[in-house]
């Protein structure tokens, strides 16, 4: 929670300059604690639908312990669904019409699987742009994850993402490059984040559009950037929401694709994710799997218990800190009426007073 500058002590101004939340007495007096309403547009495929709910709910729930958060999951048309996922959505999700009617303070937009060479050719593109159009006028801040970042960037600025020609896959070291921005204030200046993508928006493309890059990796590129107003849209290219085992599940899925003949090459390891001990065990497993494939035998059992004992999570605490900063800023500037994005005195084009 922010400090209140109830005296002229110079330390308050010094902390403001360092990016610390410090409210004036007048602004603090206008803050009535109420619950916050956060939407989750979940576009992930059936197998990851509920895991994605847990991942983002966990990050929101791990934020400020004083404020209560109401989560509002919903989805859109144009995404293929099996019977079980469709039933889950029908039972537990809200409609976009209801979301629009009742309003949100913040909106998280997940990634999605794609089947077309260009995002605008996807069946979900038009429904997704309708959500974007509404949210940009009615929600205090939108937080986009990976594919959603690429989609909103293209929709807003007309610039398509670039295919890398390979999969950026693993856990990469990142550095905060704008330490005074409130989103990254008081977090670790170096930290890891998982990436899992074939496409990228490069720093030069973001800066040409007026975005401000806050966190990047020498090896993996930009992770975190913000819209020109510095808060209305938060762009993630990586996956800070990932569980410790998320990349392991992806790796196992690729192994099964290789064994079934869906891919020709044996999958490489996610970079900087497995320890040397795990790598050695998985190399042995890979040899056994190849032998079984050549001989037409069933695949050997995966050494999951051993692998799980040696996996580390080097990103969760920083992810929680960033989400806490994001939600805290929303709370300070959103209107008491959740259908209105800002308090009356807040400039929508410069909501943090920093642009």
Curated annotation (Swiss-Prot):
Its main location: cytoplasm. It comes from the Bacteria. HAMAP family: MetA_acyltransf. The record marks 113, 147 as: Important for acyl-CoA specificity. Its EC number is 2.3.1.46. Substrate binds at residues 167, 196, 253. One of its GO terms (cellular component) is cytoplasm. Keywords: Acyltransferase, Amino-acid biosynthesis, Cytoplasm, Methionine biosynthesis, Transferase. It is an enzyme of class 2 (transferase). This is Homoserine O-succinyltransferase. Pathway: Amino-acid biosynthesis; L-methionine biosynthesis via de novo pathway; O-succinyl-L-homoserine from L-homoserine: step 1/1. The active site is at residues 146, 239, 241. Belongs to the MetA family. It catalyses: L-homoserine + succinyl-CoA = O-succinyl-L-homoserine + CoA. One of its GO terms (biological process) is methionine biosynthetic process. Transfers a succinyl group from succinyl-CoA to L-homoserine, forming succinyl-L-homoserine. It is found in: Cytoplasm. Disulfide bonds: none annotated. The record marks 196 as: Important for substrate specificity.
């Amino acid at each position: 929670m922010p400090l209140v500058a109830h005296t002229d002590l110079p330390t308050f101004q010094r902390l403001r300059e360092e990016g610390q939340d410090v409210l004036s007495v007048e602004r603090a007096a206008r803050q009535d604690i109420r619950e916050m309403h956060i939407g989750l547009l979940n576009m992930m495929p059936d197998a990851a639908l509920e895991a994605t709910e847990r991942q983002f709910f966990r990050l929101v729930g791990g934020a400020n312990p004083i404020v209560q958060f109401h989560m509002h999951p919903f989805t859109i048309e144009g995404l293929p669904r099996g019977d079980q996922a469709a039933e889950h959505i029908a039972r537990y999700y809200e409609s976009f019409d209801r979301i629009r009617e009742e309003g949100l303070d913040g909106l998280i937009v997940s990634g999605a699987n794609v089947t077309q060479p260009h995002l605008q050719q996807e069946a979900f593109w038009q429904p997704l742009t309708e959500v974007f159009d509404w949210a940009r006028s009615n929600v205090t801040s939108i937080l986009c994850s990976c594919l959603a970042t690429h989609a909103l960037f293209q929709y807003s600025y007309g610039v398509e993402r670039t295919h890398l020609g390979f999969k950026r896959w693993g856990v990469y070291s990142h550095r905060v490059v704008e330490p005074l921005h409130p989103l990254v204030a008081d977090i670790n200046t170096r930290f890891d984040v998982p990436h899992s993508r074939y496409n990228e928006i490069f720093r030069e493309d973001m800066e040409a559009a007026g975005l401000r890059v806050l966190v990047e990796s020498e090896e993996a590129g930009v992770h975190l950037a913000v819209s020109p107003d510095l808060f209305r849209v938060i762009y993630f290219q990586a996956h800070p929401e990932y569980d410790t085992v998320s990349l392991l599940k992806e790796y196992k899925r690729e192994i099964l694709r290789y064994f079934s003949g869906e891919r020709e090459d044996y999958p490489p390891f996610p970079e900087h994710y497995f320890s040397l001990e795990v790598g050695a065990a998985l190399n042995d497993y890979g040899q056994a799997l190849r032998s079984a494939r050549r001989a037409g035998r069933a695949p050997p059992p995966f050494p999951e218990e051993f692998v799980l004992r040696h996996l580390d999570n080097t990103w969760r605490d920083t992810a929680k800190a960033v989400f806490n900063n994001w939600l805290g800023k929303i709370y300070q500037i959103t209107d008491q009426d959740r259908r209105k994005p800002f308090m009356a005195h807040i400039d929508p084009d410069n909501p943090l007073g920093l642009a």
